[in-house]
Structures are given as structure tokens and as C-alpha cells.
């Protein structure tokens, strides 16, 4: 809806950037599959190439796409990351910046172990991304302060943004 919308006589994305200095992103995932192996992959995204071309033409900067990890299952985490980075490559090829968002369930009893497996997997996949066309990461606040520093410093990462993922505002701010 927002992609085709307008404000003050301008297309929404251009208005957000030019008038409000808000960087426009487009949510492209179509929701989540049922949980399988402790994770929820993204549902298929029909018409992706056309959507990305339209977003680029309308002044969108990047995309957002979310998956969820609920258990420390290395095969499931790898499946989430494979899907996220495959989609990220398509977004990059369209001239947009993807926000890779593998959300970790904050109620997972093995959250810290999930984070360790997730970080390993992200670092491996980041090494396949050209630093000239970096990705962004949206990550659940980690159990250990500074845990994602290697990701923040990676040359193929434009920015890492925090995902509060169910924490109260006060708890998220404290983390």
C-alpha cells in the first residue's frame, strides 16, 4: 500500500526521504511458514523481481525480510540463513539494500547457544558478499553485551540494527 501511496503530491518513498529524511524500506516477506525444526522460514514471495524493480524505480532504499529461530538446531538455523542470504543477493542485484532479519525468540531456553550458532553462520555467509554492496542486519538483542561486534565490524555489513523482539522498552533499552 505505501509503495503505491503518495504524500503531499510525491510518491511515498521519495516524500519520506526528500521531505522527512526517513530512509524508505519495503517489507517484502509474505509471512512465515509453520515452525519446523525449531525455525520458521519465510513463505514464498511471488513476483519478487517485479516488486524489487518497482521499489527501486520509486526510490525505495532497501528491503526487510524476517525469519524466526526458536531452538538451537544447526540445520534449521542454516536453512534460515541460506534463505535469508539467497534473498539478500536478489535484493542486492536489484540495486537495493536488504535487511537480513533472522529473529531469535527471546523466550528460547538456549538463546545464547542459538546466538553463537547464528553468528557463526552469518559470518560464513557475509564472506560471500561483496563489501561494495553490503547488507544490513537486524538482530535480536544478544544475551552477552558486544556479542555481535564482529558482525558490526564486518566489511560486508552496512549497519546492524537492534531487534527488541518482545522485550519491554525498558528491558530493551537496558540491554
Region locations from a protein language model:
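Short glycine/threonine-rich loop-to-helix capping motif typified by GTGT followed
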Residues: 77-78, 109-119, 143-154
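Alpha-helical scaffolding segments of alpha/beta enzyme cores, especially the outer helices
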Residues: 11, 50, 79-93, 116-125, ...
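Alpha/beta catalytic barrel-like cores
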Residues: 1-61, 69-71, 122-124, 128, ...
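A structural motif
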Residues: 60, 93-96
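Intrinsically disordered, low-complexity polar/charged tails and linkers
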Residues: 138-140
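Surface-exposed cleft-lining segments at the edges of enzyme active sites
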Residues: 35-40, 64-78, 105-112
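Conserved, mostly hydrophobic/aromatic
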Residues: 100
Amino acid at each position: 500500500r505505501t509503495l503505491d501511496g503518495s504524500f503531499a503530491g510525491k510518491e511515498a518513498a521519495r516524500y519520506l526521504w526528500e521531505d522527512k529524511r526517513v530512509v524508505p524500506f519495503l517489507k517484502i516477506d509474505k509471512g512465515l511458514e509453520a515452525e519446523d525444526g525449531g525455525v520458521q522460514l519465510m513463505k514464498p514471495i511471488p513476483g519478487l523481481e517485479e516488486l524489487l524493480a518497482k521499489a527501486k524505480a520509486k526510490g525505495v532504499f532497501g528491503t526487510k525480510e524476517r525469519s524466526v529461530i526458536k531452538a538451537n538446531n544447526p540445520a534449521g538455523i542454516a536453512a534460515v540463513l541460506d534463505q535469508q542470504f539467497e534473498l539478500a543477493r536478489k535484493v542486492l542485484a536489484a540495486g537495493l539494500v536488504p535487511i537480513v532479519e533472522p529473529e531469535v525468540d527471546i523466550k528460547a531456553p538456549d538463546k545464547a547457544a542459538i546466538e553463537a550458532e547464528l553468528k557463526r553462520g552469518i559470518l560464513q555467509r557475509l564472506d560471500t558478499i561483496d563489501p561494495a554492496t553490503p547488507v544490513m542486519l537486524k538482530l535480536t538483542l544478544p544475551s552477552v553485551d558486544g556479542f555481535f561486534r564482529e558482525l558490526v565490524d564486518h566489511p560486508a555489513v552496512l549497519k546492524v540494527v537492534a531487534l527488541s523482539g518482545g522485550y519491554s522498552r525498558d528491558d530493551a533499552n537496558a540491554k
